[in-house]
Amino acid sequence: MDDRLSWKFHIQGLSKKLSRTIGILYRLRKMNSPKSILTSIYFALFQSQISYGLLAWGTACNDLIDKIFFLQKRAVRIISNAGFNDHTQPLFKKLSILNIRDIFKHQIASFMYEYESGNLPTIFDSFFKRVNESIIRD
């Protein structure tokens, strides 16, 4: 986060890291590496970078999230050996990869489940209040 309370600087740095991973995937695909290896590398090097801290920066403006999503689509096309203009939604499904927005939703759902189960520190109680048996964020 920068001095203007924006995630732009963080996402630019993340984009550079993800671009390097895309280069690795591309070179490995050119060496005829199996799709299973490419997928494993994607999860180890790409998705792990996306997931780290996503609960904090996942609410950044759509323009910034779209930059990451664009890189994610490139990675999925490389793994699938698909063309530049091929639609990626079926590729995501075939590879069992969630897009960045779905990863964010999953992390929120997991966090709220852990909160409701009482598995989180009590400090998080001050973040939420109950209204008619529902939880809303302060």
Outline where the language-model segments fall.
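Hydrophobic/basic alpha-helical segments
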Residues: 1-138
